[in-house]
Amino acid sequence: MASTRSIELEHFEERDKRPRPGSRRGAPSSSGGSSISGPKGNGLIPSPAHSAHCSFYRTRTLQALSSEKKAKKARFYRNGDRYFKGLVFAISSDRFRSFDALLIELTRSLSDNVNLPQGVRTIYTVDGSRKVTSLDELLEGESYVCASNEPFRKVDYTKNVNPNWSVNIKGGTTRTLAVASAKSEVKESKDFIKPKLVTVIRSGVKPRKAVRILLNKKTAHSFEQVLTDITEAIKLDSGVVKRLCTLDGKQVTCLQDFFGDDDVFIACGPEKYRYAQDDFVLDHSECRVLKSSYSRASAAKYSGSRSPGLSRRSKSPASVKRAGHSSAYSTAKSPVNGTPSSQLSTPKSTKSSSSSPTSPGSFRGLKQISAQGRSSSNVNGGPELDRCMSPEGVNGNRCSESFTLLEKYRIGKVIGDGNFAVVKECMDRSTGKEFALKIIDKAKCCGKEHLIENEVSILRRVKHPNIIMLVEEMETTTELFLVMELVKGGDLFDAITSSTKYTERDGSAMVYNLASALRYLHGLSIVHRDIKPENLLVCEYPDGTKSLKLGDFGLATVVEGPLYTVCGTPTYVAPEIIAETGYGLKVDVWAAGVITYILLCGFPPFRSENNLQEDLFDQILAGKLEFPAPYWDNITDSAKELISQMLQVNVEARCTAGEILSHPWVSDDASQENNMQAEVTGKLKQHFNNALPKQNSTTTGVSVIMNTALDKEGQVFCSKHCRDSSKSSREQTSAREAPPPPESPRPPGPPATSGCDPAGTWRRHRD
């Protein structure tokens, strides 16, 4: 009853009770003996509520009350923000009991770390003529400007709502006619607008915010409007978005640029923008976001500045698709006779290398275009896949003209997207064995087909239990299909960090696997040139044993003479590569020695305290090898002796892969069974970012398969000796003359057998 009366008090006025005519309980008046007539005598309406205490009389009509209760709609702008379209608020006494409550709600909606960081404390009229201090001063349909403590900034806020894309424009004005005319002109030139999802990444320090925006005829009315939408979504620290750049560094200048080949853009503010390499390189987290965004897209494209430094090439999940490139790949398979080093050389960048928190390597940028010529459509039954253009198989296998990939293999989802190749799940229909189908788009390799051909020709020749095998090869006019062995056990670091027990004997077995693969390759006069833990994958067998398999032959080549191309990964690069005096097969032995050192202590033998590449190279050239205590106190002298032989700066004194296999520490199990898993794992995580636990070990194997020779261009680096142009000229002459190789390659040995001799949980394949 009390709540009902409180509501009625808002609409009725309490007055003194007057006696009704004829009422028995009426009291005579005390003034002059005269009596006051009833309510009708005063023209008042009797109260519907008859109480012993009071009566209520209606003073306002229901229409007036309804008008008072109706919310007033007003638009609020940010002070000085000419790109903010304004926010419409419905203001009613029920929603906002006080003016302060409105300020709190406006702060929540309009304030962030860039705009109004101190909150909304003042409201101006749209012309700045006065301040609003109460809810009653807010009028229906008017606009207001919100500010903190700063003075009013004079801006034509009403123009922020661009009439070119407003849906509520009222007709009848000259401005409206002009807008309508402009709309008709724009419609005539908007045939290029097709529905497209683009990703915009804010410039600045990583990790960077990325937003996805759908562009179509309803959302992309003008270039300025799209910029405004991006500004509102991306929220740059420096304010509004002034320019957009593709991952190639090209500035977007018109609406049509959004509908080209590029799908990823970098948003830049009003600050002077420096085109640094880091801004156009996506790190691992950004690539994951983009991969999830475009996993259902019909095509993907990779681009961006090359990574000039020596670094681990972690592959981001995207591929490149260049429109207009339709060069045919030669269907004839020439025998491997070695690719000259001059063919593998690429222009050397002068920019410094970059790194990300998750990986010391750089990433290519990601782009996406339409589905023209996309390999995934072909794999799923397109006409191109129904023809096997090359009758020549791999390792003696033949495929008939009528043979199709889909008849023999069941093709699954995409499990890896690289710069120049896409990797899909692949299962043999007859055996159920899993493989990885690597699809290389020839259009992306235009002008550099010899690099791919060199890599594939080497893969055709090698067949060893410690090397990832090329199972089958097929080809169409637009794509190259490689059925590869799929290794799911992770890389070398994963094998150590994920195990519960890791001993010196396990490390000995790992070195045996690596040396076995190197002896086989060197017997074919093939140098790998990129031996590192990331390219050593763990193969797990049904009986619980494991072995290492070497992959990623993008830098591999046949040694016909001294090589001068400066390439590799800094930690594992041999001194003769840095010195540029010519090198051969034994650069792989040096890298294997560095890996052996890391396997036993968790950190590399040569390292820079300041993380400077020049310091690292100086230490490698000096070759001063130390076994610091206490990390090496429990390691056998036999292991230290082998490492010292593998890390000889003098190439002639350095041991060969065959000598590694015959060393007692490797062949006679002269190693100990002491568990050093915790110590080695701790140092690995301290010195190697890629040694951190991975969510999916299969991803590591897919990344190795996904690499191509074209991805290795970033690992052809400029050493400190390359600054002398005269020496560079001399080296080019020496490379053309091709003097005899520094070491005599052994004749190819017989194919390795599949027998194994268990050593702990690690297999040792005997050649």
Swiss-Prot record:
Name of the molecule in the record: Serine/threonine-protein kinase DCLK2
Function statement: Protein kinase with a significantly reduced Ca(2+)+/CAM affinity and dependence compared to other members of the CaMK family. May play a role in the down-regulation of CRE-dependent gene activation probably by phosphorylation of the CREB coactivator CRTC2/TORC2 and the resulting retention of TORC2 in the cytoplasm.
Pfam families: DCX, Pkinase
Enzyme's top EC category: transferase
Subunit and interaction comment: Interacts with MAPK8IP1/JIP-1, MAPK8IP2/JIP-2, MAPK9/JNK2, PPP1R9B/NEURABIN-2 and actin. Binds to and stabilizes microtubules; binding affinity is strongly reduced by autophosphorylation.
Active site, renumbered: 530 (proton acceptor)
Free-text description of this protein's post-translational modifications in UniProt: Autophosphorylated.
One Gene Ontology CC term in the entry: cytoskeleton
GO biological process: hippocampus development; intracellular signal transduction; microtubule cytoskeleton organization; negative regulation of protein localization to nucleus; protein localization to nucleus; pyramidal neuron development
Catalytic activity: L-seryl-[protein] + ATP = O-phospho-L-seryl-[protein] + ADP + H(+); L-threonyl-[protein] + ATP = O-phospho-L-threonyl-[protein] + ADP + H(+)
SUPFAM superfamilies: Doublecortin (DC), Protein kinase-like (PK-like)
Domains (record comment): The doublecortin domains are involved in the binding to microtubules.
Residue positions, PTM Phosphothreonine: 61, 681
Lineage: Eukaryota, Metazoa, Chordata, Craniata, Vertebrata
Ranges for domain Protein kinase: 409-666
Ranges of biased composition (kind: Pro residues): 738-751
Residues the entry annotates as binding ATP: 415-423, 438
Keywords: ATP-binding, Cytoplasm, Cytoskeleton, Kinase, Nucleotide-binding, Phosphoprotein, Repeat, Serine/threonine-protein kinase, Transferase
Location within or outside the cell: Cytoplasm, Cytoskeleton
